[in-house]
Amino acid sequence: MDGTLLASNLGFPEGPVVMPDGAIVFCDGNTGELRSWKDGALDTYAYTGGSPWGAVLGSDGAIYVTQGGPVPGSDESGVVSGIQRVDADGTVELLSSSIAGHTLIGPNDLAFGPDGRLWFTDSGSEQDFRFDVRVPGKLYVLDATGGGELLMERPEVYPNGIAFDEHERMYWTESAARRICRLDDGKGTVWAQLSDGHVPDGMAFAADGRAFVCTTVSGGVTVLSAGGEVLEEIHLGEHATNCIFAGSTLYVTATKVADIHVDQRTGTFWSVETDATGLPLIPGRL
């Protein structure tokens, strides 16, 4: 499986979503924007400010975003870490900046779960890939009333990407530990341990149970079996950050340099034609 470069000179792209009209909207953590790509044209979908990292499309047509706060090098003020909702007209609303008394520090990725709530990771750092910030990460859920709960606190492992498989089991990546974990009976278990140089970020499941995991440093996407074994590598030559399926096409956000700064423009956007069919995401709204 080979990748096709669709766009370049982006900031720090992350969190792609597939829109009903076929457009792909993704976050740009360096420019504070949601960007829209369709048929070769790249536009600004909305301005969130700060560092948007993850996104998921709600059944209400809104895009729900993890907001990491002001990007380094900017003069922004008033942008706080939290969960945002972006309506189709570009209106941005902060839904929550704390859960169950815990201030959100570095919300990273998110997905709707089978219970209708929004599940998300908080890496414990305001900015992506700050593994030197050794504070615990957390996993949270947010419900439609604005309430929520802390699912668990993780050690200094940088919880990152999150996804549900065909059995509606929740998985998340732990970048600093190079592993993917699964929630089993309320506890986190290690589902797959990756080798040196494979730092997992965002991920997407195929309908057959395979997991397509974006791995920075290694320069592409690592494909795992339903049992967690490495099957193959999709080499892009860049730090792959997140991905999403549209049918059998895997759309991947990436960056040549994993540097978060308002002036950095090394991000790229790719498509990969695969032999898989993407698993439909669980619908939800808040």
What positions do the PLM features span?
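Sequence-structural signature of mature extracellular/luminal beta-sheet repeat domains
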Residues: M1-L286
